[in-house]
Amino acid sequence: MMITLRKLPLAVAVAAGVMSAQAMAVDFHGYARSGIGWTGSGGEQQCFQTTGAQSKYRLGNECETYAELKLGQEVWKEGDKSFYFDTNVAYSVAQQNDWEATDPAFREANVQGKNLIEWLPGSTIWAGKRFYQRHDVHMIDFYYWDISGPGAGLENIDVGFGKLSLAATRSSEAGGSSSFASNNIYDYTNETANDVFDVRLAQMEINPGGTLELGVDYGRANLRDNYRLVDGASKDGWLFTAEHTQSVLKGFNKFVVQYATDSMTSQGKGLSQGSGVAFDNEKFAYNINNNGHMLRILDHGAISMGDNWDMMYVGMYQDINWDNDNGTKWWTVGIRPMYKWTPIMSTVMEIGYDNVESQRTGDKNNQYKITLAQQWQAGDSIWSRPAIRVFATYAKWDEKWGYDYTGSSSTNPYYGKAVSADFNGGSFGRGDSDEWTFGAQMEIWW
């Protein structure tokens, strides 16, 4: 069809608008999960996690609606040089009602500049809040190396035999105290900045299909002028990480060894807590501290076993040994096999076991959890999402110890400490029981 002169300006404007929209297209990524569930003994879905464990087996065992919404855009590009702006807002509600208001968490807001340094081709300069090179076990939602937060860095520097990355990030915690000479008042609820300095050397090919990553993190409490720390605060600490990744059976296996000291032992993933530990809304911190060390040995992966079977797996031993005897020994093992009936329908089972020993009491808490789910997903991989699943979960536990949060830290000398289940005639931990739940859930990442 011939375009008249009158219509030509409109056609040009529309075409220009389309090209402009494509050039300025915004990247939309994210993650979300939500569903509905019931408990066999009555009421809404309960979720099961062993006291003292830092995570739980998640299939058929998530009781909240959670979402991360990421918007990003390459805002400038010239040759191989570019600037990218990235954001991430997260939400979490209890999925109990239609209208559930919550304050969003601003997780990411950063700019990444690629190839800006002529003599470091392939490297990236970045600054802002960021999820920084996180390492996790998906099936237990456990992040074992994660220094995310506000920060800055230079990453992916090619050193010939690997990629070097340097970063500094920050997290804050209650525990720092402001002192006033006139009345000697201490307010332990003030936040104290903790800085983490991270060095990583990754992508070192050491065997066919295998790579090695090494990392060192140093964390320290960074006090303002006229501030002091609670007595016995650890102040600083180190985390050393070695991770070997092997390509195997159309998937991967990761073997990880980590060792941490003092302020880096509480979370054990690279974030520092060096100012002491405050509980809830206490007016001053309980003088517990995290001086000591942590050892973690972890193996996890995901593999394909023929055309119809995929499987995730994890095995981990973690020993947090604190000078105050409030540490734990935690070991966990689990598998998640998946049988694919069609390219979009599968049956998934998850079996997981946790055992946590209290350093103080010597008692042990244990739990095993089994989930069977029928699932429809967008593809034939165990990683394919979105997925809609119906599930049934059975959990049985036997807990011999718990943490004493009776009263307050000012009145209870055992506040925050591990105690036996029947300590002082009380009831700590979850006892010896079992339960089953059932429901439906969607999960998506894009």
UniProtKB/Swiss-Prot annotation:
Reactions catalysed, as given in the entry: beta-maltose(in) = beta-maltose(out)
Induction field: By maltose.
Subcellular location: Cell outer membrane
Signal peptide annotation: 1-25
Disulfide bonds: 47-63
BP GO terms, sorted: monoatomic ion transport
GO cellular component, one term: cell outer membrane
Keywords: Cell outer membrane, Disulfide bond, Ion transport, Membrane, Porin, Signal, Sugar transport, Transmembrane, Transmembrane beta strand, Transport
CDD domains in the cross-refs: Maltoporin-like (cd01346)
Topological domains, Extracellular: 36-64, 94-104, 131-148, 174-191, 223-234, 264-290, 324-326, 360-362, 401-430
Pfam families: LamB
GO MF annotation: an example: maltodextrin transmembrane transporter activity
Function according to Swiss-Prot or TrEMBL: Involved in the transport of maltose and maltodextrins.
Protein name: Maltoporin
Organism: Escherichia coli O6:H1 (strain CFT073 / ATCC 700928 / UPEC)
